[in-house]
Curated annotation (Swiss-Prot):
Lineage: Bacteria, Pseudomonadati, Pseudomonadota, Gammaproteobacteria, Thiotrichales
UniProt keyword list: Cytoplasm, Metal-binding, NAD, Oxidoreductase, Zinc
Segments forming a coiled coil: none
Function: Catalyzes the NAD(+)-dependent oxidation of L-threonine to 2-amino-3-ketobutyrate.
The protein, known as: L-threonine 3-dehydrogenase
Active site (record annotation): T41 (charge relay system), H44 (charge relay system)
A Pfam family annotated for this UniProt entry: ADH_zinc_N
Length: 351
C-alpha cells in the first residue's frame, strides 16, 4: 500500500508504495483511509526536532488525524460494520489501569499514539482497535471528521470550565486555538481575546468571532505586553480580569501574561506544550486563587459526542480548513504548514 513514512533520522518525510497492508486482530477493524489532516505533531516529526529524535522510532508511518471507511473487521467486533464511515481516537490505552477502569481513559499511564509509537494514518489502510473507532454521522463530511482529533483537543480545553457569559483569553492562534474561538463563541462567551504573532491566523480568529485578536510580536518585553493587554481590556469595557484562560502556545511569556491579567478566582486550561522549563509567578496563582488544569488529548468519548453534537447544532468548523490537496502533493502540504499561512491542511487519499 501507499504510505508516508519517516524513513531517515533527518528532516523530511517520504512516500513509499510497498508498505504491507496491516493485519487486523480479533477486536480490530481495518480502515481504508479517505482523508487525513496534517497536525503540528506531524510537522515536528517532519522537521526532526529534539522531541522527535527522542520519541519516534524509524522507520515509522506517521499521521493520526483521519477519516475513512471500515473494510474488514475481526470476529469479536460488533460495534461497527463494514461500510461504516469512521474516524478514531489516536491514543491507544491499556484498559486495565485504575484510570481506564474508572472511565478516565485519557489519563492512562500507558498511552501510546498512532503515528508516533505505532503505525499511523498516513497510509491507504489503518488497523485500530474497535473500541477506539468513532462512527461519523451522515451530516458531517469526511474533511471535517479528519480534524476531529485537534477539534477534540479544543473542545476538551475550552469546555473544561463554563464559558457562558465569561471573558475568555486564548494564547496561541494555531488551528486548535482558532477552533477554541469558534467553540467559545458558539457556547456564549462574552468577550474573546486571542494573542499570537501570526497575522494570517489572527485574521482568521477575527473572522471566527474573536472580540480582539492581538499581534504580540511588536512588544519587546513582558511589561510592554501586559500594558498593551490591559489597554485592550479597557478598550473593550473590561473592568476586571479574564474569567477563563485557554493556553495553547506553550510560550513562557504568554503564560506569564495570562497569569497577570486573570481575574481572582479565574480558571486556566493548559494545552500548549513547552520546549523547555516554564517560569511563572507562583504568588499570582496562590493569591488570585487560580485553578489550573492540564489538558492531554480528548476525554474518551465524551469529547467526541460533544463535538459531533455541537457540529450538528450548527457550529461551523468548515472555515478552519484552508487547503485541500491530493496525497501526491503532500510535500506542498507540509510546506504550507511550515509557512504558518494556513488553517488545517487536508490530504485526499482517493485514487
Amino acid at each position: 500500500m501507499k504510505a508516508l513514512a519517516k524513513l531517515k533520522k533527518q528532516p523530511g518525510i517520504w512516500m513509499i508504495d510497498d508498505a504491507p497492508i496491516p493485519e487486523y486482530g480479533y477486536n480490530d477493524v481495518l480502515i481504508k483511509i479517505k482523508k487525513t489532516a496534517i497536525c503540528g505533531t506531524d510537522l515536528h516529526i517532519y522537521n526532526w526536532d529534539k522531541w522527535s529524535q527522542n520519541t519516534i522510532p524509524v522507520p515509522m508511518i506517521t499521521g493520526h488525524e483521519f477519516a475513512g471507511e471500515v473494510v474488514a473487521k475481526g470476529d469479536g467486533v460488533t460495534s461497527v460494520d463494514i461500510g461504516d464511515r469512521v474516524s478514531g481516537e489516536g491514543h491507544l490505552v491499556c484498559g486495565q489501569c485504575r484510570n481506564c477502569r474508572a472511565g478516565k481513559r485519557h489519563l492512562c499511564r500507558k498511552t501510546i499514539g498512532i503515528g508516533v509509537n505505532v503505525q499511523g494514518a498516513f497510509a491507504e489502510y489503518l488497523v485500530m482497535p474497535a473500541v477506539n473507532v468513532f462512527k461519523i454521522p451522515d451530516s458531517i463530511s469526511d474533511d471535517i471528521a479528519s480534524t476531529f482529533d485537534p477539534m477534540g483537543n479544543a473542545i476538551h480545553t475550552a469546555l473544561s470550565f463554563n464559558l457562558t457569559g465569561e471573558d475568555v483569553l486564548i494564547t496561541g492562534a494555531g488551528p486548535i486555538g482558532l477552533m477554541a474561538v469558534k467553540i467559545a463563541r458558539f457556547c456564549g462567551a462574552r468577550r474573546i481575546v486571542i494573542t499570537d504573532i501570526n497575522e494570517y491566523r489572527l485574521q482568521m480568529a477575527r473572522d471566527f468571532g474573536a472580540t480582539v485578536a492581538l499581534n504580540v510580536a511588536p512588544f519587546k518585553n513582558q511589561d510592554e505586553l501586559v500594558k498593551q493587554m490591559r489597554k485592550v481590556m479597557s478598550d473593550i469595557g473590561m473592568t476586571e480580569g479574564f474569567d477563563i484562560g485557554l493556553e495553547m502556545s506553550g510560550i513562557n511569556s504568554a503564560i506569564s501574561m495570562m497569569l497577570d491579567v486573570m481575574n481572582h478566582g479565574g480558571k486556566l486550561s493548559l494545552l500548549g506544550i513547552s520546549a523547555g522549563d516554564i517560569s511563572v509567578d507562583w504568588g499570582a496563582i496562590l493569591f488570585k486563587g487560580l485553578t489550573l488544569k492540564g489538558i492531554y488529548g480528548r476525554e474518551m468519548f465524551e469529547t467526541w459526542y460533544l463535538m459531533t453534537s455541537m457540529l450538528q447544532a450548527g457550529m461551523d468548523m468548515n472555515p478552519i480548513i484552508t487547503h485541500r490537496l491530493h496525497i501526491d502533493e503532500f510535500q506542498k502540504g507540509f510546506e504550507i504548514m511550515k509557512s504558518g499561512q494556513c488553517g488545517k491542511v487536508i490530504l485526499d487519499w482517493s485514487s
